């Protein structure tokens, strides 16, 4: 039994294994429970293991590596084309192993427990932000149904709702006022929770030398800096900065054939939250550069905006920032202003 590539279909209790040799032929299949999994892998000579990016993938990656194996995490969308036959654990494990063999396969960057801790902060914060947005939208809709409009911004809602509740002449019933008051209390509570996560992210930022280095890039703040470090670490999974920018989805979608090259909108692949942070920061850079033409960066931004418009310039700045940050993390260097 000469296993070089081992695909493992992860689950809660039952795991399916499929081993391939150098020629890609299946030479090993096994179905094992959670308690027996580690002993099973300990009896297999060191090989390259592939697992899908799912819940617990990074935990198992660290555990398998302690047994002497090399482990790669693959996005499910890259595994699906290699599935043959019906949907079952055996075919899924074999598809993972076949995908693992591909020389051009893109793998998910590994994450340490510390990186996962930081990512958890961002995920939890974003969930609460979405909940607060939904709460404000509900309050706005309920009031508009009674002929009382309020602005769309969160800050406007925070100022307007107390005044509406105190206005005895706006026609709201007592029951409606109590309902809006409860929703407004929920809105304020969510705001306090968001503030808690903001402070936690600031603490992580102050304690991380890498985060502080990349935050010197224009358009990069504590949230983006910590999110980048949590997502890619030192960026060793990427060949270059262009590869990282493409992984983020900050490159044009291509639809070309022969000599006809067609570039479309962004591919919007990869981490949506991280890409959003890059776009927000780049948008601020473009706005500031409008009133300040000093420096090479501002001149480039303004010239590009005249030719391509605000939105395309924003994406171009985000792409440039991503490539700069990858270089800084990969080579452990500081930001050099041109």
For every predicted segment, state its role.
Residues 213-216, 222, 226-306, 310:
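Phosphate-backbone recognition surface of nucleic-acid-processing proteins
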Residues 259, 298-338:
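Low-complexity, acidic/Ser/Thr- and charged residue-rich accessory regions of DNA metabolism proteins
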Residues 23-47:
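Nucleic-acid-processing active sites and adjacent nucleic-acid-binding tracks
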Residues 43-81:
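Conserved DEDDh/DEDDy metal-dependent 3′-5′ exonuclease domain
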Residues 123-213:
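Glycine-rich, often acidic, oxyanion-interacting loops/wings at catalytic, nucleic-acid
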Residues 1-3, 195-220, 228-234:
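Extended, structured, electrostatic nucleic-acid-contact surfaces
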Residues 2-20, 96:
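Gly/Thr-rich phosphate-binding beta-strand-loop-beta motif of the actin/hexokinase/Hsp70
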Residues 72-120, 161-166, 258-273:
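Short alpha-helix plus adjacent loop in nuclease-associated cores
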